[in-house]
Amino acid sequence: MAGPGWGPPRLDGFILTERLGSGTYATVYKAYAKKDTREVVAIKCVAKKSLNKASVENLLTEIEILKGIRHPHIVQLKDFQWDSDNIYLIMEFCAGGDLSRFIHTRRILPEKVARVFMQQLASALQFLHERNISHLDLKPQNILLSSLEKPHLKLADFGFAQHMSPWDEKHVLRGSPLYMAPEMVCQRQYDARVDLWSMGVILYEALFGQPPFASRSFSELEEKIRSNRVIELPLRPLLSRDCRDLLQRLLERDPSRRISFQDFFAHPWVDLEHMPSGESLGRATALVVQAVKKDQEGDSAAALSLYCKALDFFVPALHYEVDAQRKEAIKAKVGQYVSRAEELKAIVSSSNQALLRQGTSARDLLREMARDKPRLLAALEVASAAMAKEEAAGGEQDALDLYQHSLGELLLLLAAEPPGRRRELLHTEVQNLMARAEYLKEQVKMRESRWEADTLDKEGLSESVRSSCTLQ
C-alpha cells in the first residue's frame, strides 16, 4: 500500500529508503527486501493518477520488454506489483549512479575507458537488435553503473522502447532532443538507426565532455539539429583513427549513410569479438594449443599468427578475471607467450626480408611493364614506400597504412587487368603485399596487447578507471 504524507510509499516485502531520482511520472527509491537475504533493489514507483494513455502504453511496453530479457548490460526487472495508488517496478540496484554524472564529475573520459564502456553498450544494443527492439531514448542519464569500484554499464529506462524490425518506420516523436537523431525532428519519420546516432552522441560526450549539439537555448538547439552541417570532431584530445572513424560514421545526419548495425558491431574500435567475457580465457587457451603445435612443427609464421591471436583474447581475459591469484597466473602465462612470440617474430622477419629480396626482380619487371599505366605505377610506388617504412624501426603503423592504401588501388586494377604476363605479375605482387600487411597488422596488435597487459600488471581495470578519470 502507499503510505500517507511525503515519505516513500509502503510496499509489502520491502523497506523503501532514499530517493534515487524522479521523472515525469515516476520516482525511484532504493529499497531492501525484508527476506533473510536483505537484497538491495531499486523500486520505480509510478503514480497511477499521473498516467495518461501514452504513458500507460510506455509503461506496459517497458514491463513487457524487460520481463522477457536477461543481459549483463541491461538492468534486470525482478518483479512488478501494484496497489490502488502506484505501480511498482522492482529493478536491479546499480550503486554507481548514471553515466552522465560519471562523465561530468571527471570532465572527460580517456579513450580506453570510453572504449570499454562502448563495448558494453554495443553488446546490449546487439542483444536488443537481434530481438527487433529499439530503445529510442539512449542517453547517459539512462545508462547506470553497477558500482564505482568495478563499473559495468547497465542500459535502463525502456519507457520509449519499441519492437521494431529494421525496416519499420515510426512517426511519433520520442527521446531527448540532445541525443535525438536529426531525422526524428526534421522528417518526423525514423527507424531503428536512430539508436546508432544516439550511441555516437554518448561517445562524443564521453570523449569531449558535452554532446555535439550542446546549446544555451532551445532555439539554438533546434537550429543545430536542423542544420545540414557535418558534425566536426574537436582536435583535442587526440584520439585513435579507428575511434574518430567510428564517431564520424555514427554521427552521420543522413540515416542511409550512417553506419549499419552490423558494421557498428564489427567495427575494429568496438571489437565485440574481444570484449572481456567468461569465454575470453578459453578462446585464448585454445589458440595457444594450436600455436604450440605449429611451433613444434617448425611453422614459425603460423605459430606467430596464432600466438598473436591468443594475446588478443588474453588481455580481455585479464580484464574479466576478478580473482587476484588467477589473474597473476594468467599474467605469467601471457609473459611466456609474448617472449616466444618475440623470438618467432625475429625468425619470421628474417625470412620475410629474404622473400622480399627474392621478389625484387619480378617487382622491377612489373614496374617496367606499368610505365604506360600511371595509376598502376603510382600504386606500386606507394607499396615501395610501405616496404621502406617497414624496414625503418618503429614504422609498423605507417607502413601498414601505406600497404592498405596501395592494396586498395591494386585490387581494383587487378580486377580490370586483361589476361597476360602483367596480370600474372600483378597477382603475385598483390598476394605478397597482402601477406606483408597481415603480418604487420599482427605485429601492431601484439604490441598493443603487450602494452595493455603491462598496464594491467601494474593496476587492475577499476584502479585504471579511477586514477585516469579522477580530476586532480
Curated annotation (Swiss-Prot):
The active site is at D137. It is an enzyme of class 2 (transferase). Keywords: ATP-binding, Autophagy, Cytoplasm, Kinase, Nucleotide-binding, Phosphoprotein, Repeat, Serine/threonine-protein kinase, Transferase. GO terms for molecular function: ATP binding; protein serine kinase activity; protein serine/threonine kinase activity. Induction: Up-regulated during senescence. The modification Phosphoserine is found at S176, S300, S350, S384, S464. Gene3D superfamilies: Phosphorylase Kinase, domain 1, Phosphotransferase system, lactose/cellobiose-type IIA subunit, Transferase(Phosphotransferase) domain 1. Pfam families: MIT (PF04212), Pkinase (PF00069). Autophosphorylated. Autophosphorylation is blocked by interaction with SUFU. ATP binds at L20, G21, S22, G23, T24, Y25, A26, T27, V28, K44. Widely expressed. Highest levels observed in fetal brain. In adult tissues, high levels in brain, liver and kidney, moderate levels in testis and adrenal gland and low levels in heart, lung, stomach, thymus, prostate and placenta. In the brain, highest expression in the hippocampus, high levels also detected in the cerebellum, olfactory bulb and optic nerve. In the central nervous system, lowest levels in the spinal cord. Residues 280-348, 375-444 form the MIT domain. CDD domains: MIT_2, STKc_ULK3. It comes from the Eukaryota. Its EC number is 2.7.11.1. GO terms for cellular component: autophagosome; ciliary tip; cytoplasm; cytosol; phagophore assembly site; phagophore assembly site membrane. The keyword Phosphoprotein applies. It catalyses: L-seryl-[protein] + ATP = O-phospho-L-seryl-[protein] + ADP + H(+); L-threonyl-[protein] + ATP = O-phospho-L-threonyl-[protein] + ADP + H(+). Residues 14-270 form the Protein kinase domain. InterPro entries: Atg1-like, Kinase-like_dom_sf, MIT_dom, MIT_dom_sf, Prot_kinase_dom, Protein_kinase_ATP_BS, Ser/Thr_kinase_AS. Interacts (via protein kinase domain) with SUFU. Belongs to the protein kinase superfamily. Ser/Thr protein kinase family. APG1/unc-51/ULK1 subfamily. This is Serine/threonine-protein kinase ULK3.
